[in-house]
């Protein structure tokens, strides 16, 4: 994020490889956003103009996530798996997730739940208004070739997870 040529590099890479910008998402972590908010806002504005999606990763775990939420104008909030792992038994974590879903809707962002491992978690998240998730329920880490095979299947294994 500190490289003044980052937006140009991203734009040139998208053009060179003929990648539609809506297929790319840049995830921001708290370390990147704590450096200089004015500089980060400027850099993100340049990247946003390219049509690339911006996400705050591990939302809810950093000391300043809420402070930066309104300043950074991102497209996606990714709620950390810390809140998902005991979602079915921890009322406090359910309340935090519900609040995060409401925040994401209020800011016009998509919400992604990280670390979803069970159908019960997926169902609860869906019922709370979260429409996107990632985790072992859907797929485990895999080599690129296996990922390609997964994407080209006619009947994706994870289509009914929600």
Positions of predicted regions on the chain:
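Short, conserved glycine- and acidic-residue-centered signature motifs
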Residues: 40, 92-93, 97
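Residue-level marker of structural boundaries
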Residues: 74, 93, 152-156
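C-terminal helical cap(s) of enzyme catalytic domains, especially alpha/beta-barrels
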Residues: 126, 142-162
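The catalytic core of metal-dependent phosphodiesterases that act on cyclic dinucleotides
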Residues: 2-87, 103, 107-141
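A short alpha-helix in the C-terminal ATP-binding CA
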Residues: 28, 96-99
């Amino acid at each position: 994020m500190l490289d003044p040529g980052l937006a140009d590099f991203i734009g040139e890479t998208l053009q060179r490889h003929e990648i539609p910008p809506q297929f790319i998402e840049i995830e921001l972590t708290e370390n990147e956003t704590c450096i200089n908010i004015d500089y980060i806002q400027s850099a993100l504005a340049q990247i946003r103009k390219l049509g690339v999606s911006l996400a705050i990763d591990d939302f809810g775990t950093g000391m300043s996530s809420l402070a930066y939420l309104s300043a950074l104008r991102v497209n996606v909030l990714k709620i950390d798996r810390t809140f998902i792992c005991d979602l079915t038994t921890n009322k406090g974590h359910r309340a935090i997730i519900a609040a995060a879903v409401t925040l994401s809707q209020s800011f016009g962002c998509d919400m992604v739940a990280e670390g979803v491992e069970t159908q019960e978690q997926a169902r609860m998240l869906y019922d709370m208004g979260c429409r996107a998730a990632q985790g072992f329920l859907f797929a485990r880490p895999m080599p690129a070739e296996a990922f390609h095979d997964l994407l080209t299947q006619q009947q994706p294994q994870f289509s009914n997870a929600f």
